[in-house]
Amino acid sequence: MRGRKLIAFTGAILVCLGSYASAQQTVTDQYGTEILIDALPPDQQAQVFETQMSLESGQGQGPLRVNTDGQFFLDPGMASGGLSEEILVDYLRGVVVVPRPGDVRAEGWPGIEGIWHDFPDFPEKVGDTLNSFIGTPVSLASLDLMVREVIKAYRTSGRPVVDVLLPEQDITSGVVQLVVIEGELSRIRVEGVDASYEDYLRRQMTIKKGEPIRSNDIQRDLNWLNRSPYRKVDLIYAPGLNFGTTDIILRTVTSNPFWYYLGYENSGTELLGEDRFLFGFNWGDAFGPDQGISYQFTSDFEFDTVRAHSLVFQGGLPWRHWLTILGSYVTVDAEIPVEGADPVLVGGRNLQFSPRYAIPLNAPAGQVREIEFGFDYKSSNNDLEFGGQSVFDTTTEIFQFSAGYDITVTDGTGISRVDLQGFYSPGEWTNQNSDAVFDQARAGSSSDYLYANLGVERQQRLPEGWSLRARGQGQISNGNLQASEQIGAGGYDTVRGYEQRVIRGDEGFWGSLEVYTPPISLGRIAQWENETDELRFLAFYDQAILTNVDRLPDEPNQQELQSVGLGLRWRYSDWFRLRLDYGLPVGDNNVDGIDTNGRLHIGATANF
């Protein structure tokens, strides 16, 4: 065995630069940790800035690889590429891991076999990584690889801020000493908001000064902060005031929490009129930060057939749960066609009150999970709002409980969502919540029932700016349901090319597959000033198959819809959005009254 003295050095890690704009201040490593460029080693800073200058001057790419999103990547082997492969020690017998440079014995630490440390919560992955080097020859290049692999193991173990040092030492005995310094919080800094809001955001972080930084805890706090649609918070790590400490920077962008909107949709039905006028407002901090309300009024243009009001409160609770309360009131008037006679003028009323209580769950980086519990009260004397043509002599009342699980997963190529909901009605709570009343409103239905639905969605980025979106919903039930609880299909949000909720059933599914073109800018083509827009075209295929549990003698076994079509999505700045879809029915639909020429679906909203 050769006796050697090791010169101190530290490991290098893979980093990527989110944008090569001259104002860029941070880099993001392969685990999603954003770090100030000033905190990088000098050689990595030089590579970043050299690549910036090369791109901005048009002289080529520079020393770092840059992808199509403008991310800069440092080759993980680059830092050790120039280090010697000469064998310093034939056989690595042991590794000693200590928390402070002062704990390193310059004369070496003979007699150690395997891995030695006195950390109370030493990550298992780090131990496995170090064990993989035991028994192998030692060189400067292999030691650099060990340092980088240890850093990687710490980060995949939920320790995002760690320094691994290899101080000068004697390794003649075959034992190498590593210094592992886990970052402890020095302070939380907030950028982008005024002083009063800074304190609120700082209080939402559960980590305290002097505590070690754990990515799962930090991610949970960040998910909570970003739950508000009026706020976007990015977290950045920076060196703290003292050795071994780290600052957390909450870089925050907020939007106006109060805005109102006007809109138009042709999402109605033939009986109630297809045109819909929308007016509403959102007041995100009506009762303080993250305590907001929203209101929407929906009607036909003449305010004759449909008048719908909905009010929603959403607010975070001090113990990190989320409360949503929805209330709606709808009145409808329609002329029901009667064969061989004049139409019959009827009116109906629908009332709903639905609180929801959501509990966020612990989840790894890139995931958001929560469970939700709720209750629904619904009162109705018609099914006109749900695509039917019936007004009843009595009013039905629904009292049902719900429970759900929701997960959103963000990965390197897109976003996936799954939403599972279950509903239970015990029945017989009031005179209008009885089997007799339910059977009168819907033959074969009872006031006690169970049903569940599952919604899934995947948004997938494709090469060259293309993208794909797949979504769908399915439902199962133990019996016939009232119209408000059935799954419906037809219209812009399920199967295009058909009237809204042209079919409905107790069970079944609908699904949609869309392919989007790369975005283009009309503003750039027309050379508009100070405005941004994005236009995408799409092609789609939609399908639905629905059925009832206890069918009447004249009901089909199932009803099916299929359509293909084209559409577009246009966003102009932050204030106008337009959707257009033309769907063409295909196949044998087994549904009466279908326009085989298809249907154009329009929706436009202007925000102020």
Show the residue positions of the predicted features:
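Bacterial N-terminal signal peptides that target proteins for export
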Residues: 1-9
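Bacterial N-terminal signal peptides
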Residues: 8-18
